[in-house]
Structures are given as structure tokens and as C-alpha cells.
Amino acid sequence: MKFRAICENHLYQKAYSKGKRQVTNAVAVYVLPDYAAKRLARSHPERRVTNRIGLTVSTKLGSAVVRSRIRRILREGLRSLEKELSLKQGFLIVIAARGAALSMKSTEIREELRVAFRKLGMIQEP
């Protein structure tokens, strides 16, 4: 499943400053309600509201090859987590990689994401 990306810098800044934050060893997750998506849902109820995702990996973590690898692992961890769990929709989600992500396996990063989303209250209970 392809994610809708956050493309505007001001949305990243808003998520960093006003969003809820959960930090683990490998990732920092910022979550903010996407008011534009909720406004769109009210005007077009037939459309499905989804989350918009932003991934950030600092240049401090390594070369472009290393940063791209971490980005791919984060994307795959989020994709498999969405298949397994039901995440709440209509949010801006920014995932920032941290230094410990370099030495972790993809399953470990996936578990870190699961812990962060659970603590943020993003997992829908059936």
C-alpha cells in the first residue's frame, strides 16, 4: 500500500511543535490531527480519510545509501504494522529516525513503532 506523503514543510514544523510525541531508541513519532482531511471528509463523505506520512532521516546518521536504507525499513515497518493493526485515520504522522536505528533489524524497528503508536493512542480497538 502506498502512503500519502507530507509534502509541505510547514506541516512538518506544525507536527514537531504542536503534535503529540513519543520517543523510543530507534524512532521519534510525532502525531497531529489533519484538519484538512477532516474538512474534506465533511464536504465529501464518500471519500476515505487516510493518514499522511512523513519520514525524516538526518544527515548525521550517514551517507545517502544508509539514510535511504533506514527510510525503506521505516516504510516497510509502518506498512506491515498497518496490515496487522488498525491505525486511526485522519492524522499527520512524522517518523524521525534516531541513531540506534542504524544497528537495528527491521523487526526491531517495527516493534519500536508499535510501542510508540500504542503509547500515542493511535491503535484502534476493535
Predicted feature descriptions by range:
Residues 1-126:
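Positively charged, solvent-exposed patches that mediate nucleic-acid binding
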